[in-house]
Structures are given as C-alpha cells and as structure tokens.
Design a protein with these regions (language model features):
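A short secondary-structure junction signal
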Residues: 17-19, 43-48, 67-73, 89-92, ...
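Membrane helical hairpin/interfacial module
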Residues: 1-3
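Conserved PLP-binding catalytic core of the aspartate aminotransferase-like
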Residues: 172-203
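PLP-dependent enzyme catalytic core of the Aspartate aminotransferase-like
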Residues: 214-238
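Conserved active-site segment immediately N-terminal to the catalytic lysine
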Residues: 58, 72-83
Length: 238
C-alpha cells in the first residue's frame, strides 16, 4: 500500500554495514522515513538515530525492542512483533504518535487501520489472549530484573563476550563491520562450509543448538535475545 522507495542498498557489500547519516538522500515528497533497527539475518544494527531530513520516523523494532536503547520520542510510529524479545508470536506492539493517528488513509482496510484498533481498545477482533498474557509475564520479569537498564546491560555483556572471542582468532570471521555489529544477533563464518557443519554438529553434541545461520545466508548465528542467559554465551565461548 503506497509508493515506497529504497534509498540505500548494501547488497554489493554483502549487507555488512548500515547507512551512516549522509549516505542517502530522501525524496522531498516522502511522508516519512521507514527503517528496521536490527537485521537478524546478517547481524547488523543501527547504533545511531538515522537522519530523516525532518520527516517523521517509522521504525520496525521487532528484533531488538526492550533489548537496546531506543529513543521513543524521536519516532512517530514504532511497531514490533513480540516473538523475539517480548513473548510468543502472534502479538504485535505498536506505539503511535498523534501525527500517525491523524494520517490513516480513508480507504485502508480496517484490519490495517490503527485508528480502528485504538478506538476499540485493541479489541476490534478477538485478541490472542494467551500471547498477551505471556507478554505481561515477560514485562513483569523484565521489571523484576532491573527493568530496561538491566536488560540492556545484560545484552551488551553477552554480545561483548562473544565478539571478544570471535576477534581473538582469525579462524572466526565475523560478518558485520565492527561499527554496526548487532547486540541481538551475532553472525560469523568459518574458513569452509565443511568446518561450519562440523562446528554445528559438535555444538549440538555439547548441548548448544540453534546456531545455524538463516537458510538464505548460511554461516553461524547466535541470537542473544532477552530470554538468553549469559551462561549460554559463556558455554559457547568455552
């Protein structure tokens, strides 16, 4: 729905970086700038607020919300699927500004109309009650364990520990450039596909699963979401 334009593309570089301010230009007739803060496939992440040239910012924060610092006030719309950091799939958290609420097109389908959902108290259709219940439990758990500051600190400690080990030897080949490495998804390669398969098999035998990279890119990927304890990273590093 709508006329969208991609204003930056790192495909020729293998998606190892994210755009810095000044690397792209925004169409003068654009209504907003949309970006995704964390790339789960390639392990890259924004660590700065992208310049929007005065346009409202719309953010997909599905894979790092409540896991890294986020300036909510700098955005007019933030949406995030809960299935990474907040709870089970089937629940989406949406944060809207008055600007976004006032600009819903009249001909948009009701299921995509945030104003409809807001006016009905998020009960326009039968909600995923179990998913919302689990979401509430996760929020309570985060509050009991240091709140957002605690979650952010734990995630940084986990990723710092793993990146330190990956940088220790040239045998490991981290994918993302250092200035945009993801705190949530650490991705790397080994010298050969055969060694990667051997690493994954031996990791599984040691009780460490879920390390295979996304099917579209391969390699190794460790997802360090809020629910991942630092003990898991310590075991991987050992």
């Amino acid at each position: 729905i709508g006329d969208a334009s991609a204003i930056w593309d790192d495909s020729e570089n293998g998606f190892k970086s994210i755009p810095q301010n000044g690397d792209y230009s925004i169409r003068h007739d654009s209504l907003y700038l949309h970006y995704t803060s964390n790339n789960t496939l390639f392990g890259t992440q924004f660590h700065h607020l992208p310049d929007s040239n005065g346009k409202p910012r719309v953010l997909d924060a599905s894979s790092d919300i409540m896991g890294v610092p986020l300036d909510v006030s700098a955005h007019d719309l933030i949406y995030a699927g809960a299935q990474k950091n907040l709870g089970p799939s089937g629940v989406t958290v949406v944060i809207l500004s008055p600007w976004a609420m006032e600009r819903v097109p009249k001909d948009i389908p009701t299921m995509l109309d945030y104003s409809v959902h807001s006016s009905k108290g998020s009960l326009f259709n039968t909600p995923n009650t179990f998913g919302i219940f689990v979401l509430d439990r996760v929020f309570s758990w985060i509050e009991r364990n240091g709140g957002l500051e605690g979650a952010i600190s734990r995630n940084k400690a986990k990723s710092d520990l793993l990146y330190k080990e990956l940088d220790r030897s040239k045998f490991w080949i981290p994918h993302a450039n250092k200035d945009c490495r993801s705190v949530m998804n650490v991705t790397w390669r080994l010298p050969s596909i055969e060694l990667e398969e051997k690493f994954l098999q031996e990791s599984l035998e040691a009780g460490l699963g879920g390390l295979k990279g996304h099917r579209s890119v391969g390699g190794i990927r460790a997802s360090l979401y809020n629910g991942c304890p630092i003990e898991s990273v310590e075991a991987l590093v050992r």
